[in-house]
A protein has these predicted regions:
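N-terminal, active-site-proximal structural segment of metallo-dependent hydrolase catalytic domains
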Residues: 1-52, 58-59, 65-68, 165, ...
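Surface-exposed cleft-lining segments at the edges of enzyme active sites
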Residues: 111-134, 174-179
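Short, solvent-exposed loop/turn segments at secondary-structure junctions
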Residues: 11-13, 38-40, 64-65, 76, ...
Length: 273
């Protein structure tokens, strides 16, 4: 069977519900993970997703900020809401997907952006971001299967991770080395988290590291397509147990041109299980 998982920082699910519905009709992913829903749980537009067949949903939201949601056609066997760094700020939810046999664990993450100043002593938002990455690396390392385990851990992590880790994940590597999202300390911590479960960078399985690949373009760039000053902030990671199942990926760049567009576009991966 095939499983398609998409991730999208929607920058307000209620404001852009029409775009989300349009995307779901267009691509029909089995699971869509949203970040920055900016919506308290009691106001989440459940009926719209129910009508499109996404009958299994896990949401955690708050007014005006943050918020994550997993919308699925696949049943859940379990769900968890995680609180990171001692905060209940709606940044990490987890669902176990029932696909027969051992479930696939799915993490939807919205890691802090980190503000503008890349100094944790001067900027509490940046300090929070670094702490979040450290906590995730430690937490994932605690879930690593034993070397001789017969079955490896089947886990997928998606979301707006707010780090562009590779040289060609940004429009200008040298200029952005001192810009939050591409600083050496962030890239190093991203690498530590990636190493914690030997995560596979799914899109880079198909687009080699020497080629530009973006998922975000600032609203400040009026003609974003011409300037193409993008960054790859949105990621899909899979554990080695799923390596042989990875069969495709898509970044829907054209959605950045839609009316009321988010500054992020959806990233999708396909797994043949």
């Amino acid at each position: 069977m095939s499983l398609t998982v998409a991730t999208w920082n929607i920058n307000s699910v209620r404001l852009r519900i029409g775009n989300v519905e349009r995307y779901l009709r267009l691509r029909k992913p089995d699971v869509l993970c949203l970040q920055e829903t900016k919506c308290p749980d009691e106001f989440f537009p459940h009926l719209a997703f129910e009508a499109l067949g996404y009958t299994h949903r896990l949401v955690q939201g708050m007014k005006s900020y943050n918020g994550v949601a997993i919308l699925s056609k696949v049943p859940f066997t379990a769900t968890t809401i995680h609180h990171r760094c001692g905060k209940e700020d709606c940044r990490h939810i987890e669902a176990a997907l029932d696909l027969g046999g051992d479930p696939i664990l799915l993490d939807n993450l919205y890691i802090p952006a980190g503000g503008d100043i890349p100094d944790p002593d001067e900027n509490v938002k940046f300090a929070h971001k670094l702490d979040f990455y450290r906590e995730m690396a430690k937490w994932y390392a605690g879930h690593k299967p034993r070397p001789r385990a017969r079955k490896g851990l089947r886990r997928i992590a998606v979301g707006d991770l707010n780090v562009a880790p590779l040289e060609h994940d940004v429009w200008n590597h040298k200029q952005l080395l001192k810009i939050v999202s591409h600083t050496p300390v962030e890239v190093d911590l991203f690498g530590q988290m990636q190493a914690s479960l030997d995560w596979i960078d799914v899109p880079r399985r198909f687009v080699t590291a020497d080629r530009k690949l973006y998922s975000w373009w600032s609203y400040r760039n009026n003609d974003w397509r011409v300037s193409n000053r993008g960054r790859r902030l949105d990621h899909i990671l899979a554990t080695p147990a799923l390596s042989g199942a990875i069969s495709g990926h898509r970044i829907d760049t054209d959605l950045r041109d839609w009316e009321k567009a988010s500054d992020h576009v959806p990233v999708m991966a396909t797994f043949d299980l």
